[in-house]
From Swiss-Prot:
Mg(2+) binds at residues 246, 292, 319. InterPro entries: Enolase, Enolase-like_C_sf, Enolase-like_N, Enolase_C, Enolase_CS, Enolase_N. This is Enolase. Catalyzes the reversible conversion of 2-phosphoglycerate (2-PG) into phosphoenolpyruvate (PEP). It is essential for the degradation of carbohydrates via glycolysis. It catalyses: (2R)-2-phosphoglycerate = phosphoenolpyruvate + H2O. CDD domains: enolase. It comes from Lachnospira eligens (strain ATCC 27750 / DSM 3376 / VPI C15-48 / C15-B4) (Eubacterium eligens).
């Protein structure tokens, strides 16, 4: 008979994230004395349909960003509703909190409160059962290490002083033989890029996610600079590394309204069809394998056209489009919008709902990418999640800043634990034609 891991108490506290803003940390205590801890991350560019992060809005504390209400909800309502529940049944744990919240977007108790507790309960259960978190969440089938999607140049709203409209330019080490080696490759390219930027007299200070934010003039210049860094580090673009981009184009609002896009920095205006052709030309010119949020989160018709145009050879990732939400993902699958989903725990607000979103994506042939937020903590749950459900890709910043590197270091440990059964998929992590 399986052990019943009774929850005895839950406590919350206000801690700081990597941007110096408050966030929620929770601890779940089991009757056997085990403790699990979890923390909620926070995003800078947030999708309109994300679960609600509860903030105090008291301007006298942390500029209104305090989370004492969310913490109080953990110490009272959540503590009461989880008393006596089995922590190993993550669906029951999350269902109890969602029922106590009573809203669709978790705005009553706060998605940040619910998520921190959801992670803490899963961790407590895995510790009590003496198994790694990835095994607890995914069973014995989780053995694939993810290919990193490393953000090394920032643009858009992550780098307001540059001329780059695309929010993130990333490298993906598709030709590496193992996770340990892929991490080395990426670090070497990162340092080669730093050297190139220094030679040009450009800034090498890092942004929220560890990437550089140099004053480059255009998106194409950013791509070409990255390819130069790949070669300088001794690798071959296309074979060893592919490029991924996060356009975050829901931020590109035009006065002309829906179906139109205006690049805030370049000033160029596009219709959805013109923007699709812009992406197609970039993909023909450069070894781009993935584009995230290439169109607005409500432009479903445009997304279908984009997928028809590029979906057979480029990974088209919905972040703001799907917000880790099974209802929106289901609509996308039905329409043929995109072919991949970015998985962010705090967009939906619980571990069990995140697992369901990944399972739904995989069932429909979509790839899933385990992702961080720009405001992160030392919590490494997304690393375990990537292996648990074989997402095969992870997006968690540059090989710089300890809250980003913590996830990569956890994946190194997992690869070591898995030993001979560990698989690094490389180019096979994608569901597109890679000829």
């Amino acid at each position: 008979m399986a052990a019943y891991l009774e929850i005895e108490k839950v406590i919350g506290r206000e801690i700081l994230d990597s941007r110096g803003n408050p966030t929620v940390e929770a601890e779940v205590y089991l009757a056997d004395g085990t403790v699990g801890r979890g923390a909620a991350p926070s995003g800078a560019s947030t999708g309109e349909f994300e679960a609600l992060e509860l903030r105090d809005k008291d301007k006298s504390r942390y500029l209104g960003k305090g989370v004492t209400k969310a913490v109080e909800n953990i110490n009272t309502v959540i503590n009461d509703c989880l008393f006596g529940i089995d922590a190993s049944d993550i669906y029951a744990v999350d269902a109890a909190m969602i029922k106590a919240d009573g809203t669709k977007d978790k705005s009553n108790l706060g998605a940040n409160a619910i998520l921190a507790v959801s992670i803490a309960a899963a961790r407590a259960a895995s510790v009590s059962l003496d198994i790694p978190l990835y095994r607890f969440l995914g069973g014995v089938s989780g053995n694939r290490l993810p290919v990193p999607m490393m953000n090394i140049i920032n643009g858009g709203c992550h780098a307001l002083s540059s001329g780059l409209d695309v929010q993130e330019f990333m490298i993906m080490p598709v030709g590496a033989p193992s996770f340990k080696e892929c991490l080395r490759w990426c670090a070497e390219v990162f340092h080669a890029l730093a050297a190139i930027l220094k030679e040009r007299g450009l800034a090498t200070s890092v942004g929220d996610e560890g990437g550089f934010a140099p004053a480059l003039k255009s998106d194409e210049e950013a791509i070409e600079t990255i390819l130069q860094a790949v070669e300088k580090a001794g690798y071959k673009p296309g074979r060893d590394f592919r490029i991924a981009m996060d356009a975050a184009s829901s931020e590109w609002k035009s006065e002309k309204g829906k179906g139109y896009y205006k690049l805030p920095k370049a000033g160029t205006e596009y219709t959805a069809e013109e923007l699709i052709e812009h992406w197609a030309k970039l993909c023909e010119k450069y070894p781009i394998i993935s584009i995230e949020d290439g169109l607005d989160e409500e432009d479903w018709e445009g997304w279908k056209k984009l997928t028809d145009r590029l979906g057979d050879k480029v990974q088209l990732v919905g972040d703001d489009l799907f917000v880790t939400n099974t209802e929106r993902l289901s609509k996308g699958i039905e329409l043929g919008a995109g072919n991949a989903i970015l998985i962010k725990l705090n967009q939906i607000g619980s571990v069990s709902e995140t697992l369901e979103a990944i399972k739904m994506a995989h069932k429909a042939g979509y790839t899933a990418i385990s992702s961080h937020r720009s405001g992160e903590t030392a919590d490494t749950t997304i690393a375990d999640l990537a292996v648990a459900l074989n997402t095969c890709q992870i997006k968690t910043g540059a090989p710089s800043r300890s809250e980003r590197v913590a996830k990569y270091n956890q994946l190194l440990r997992i690869e070591e634990q898995l030993g001979a059964s560990a698989v690094y998929p490389g180019i096979r992590a994608f569901n597109v034609n890679n000829d």
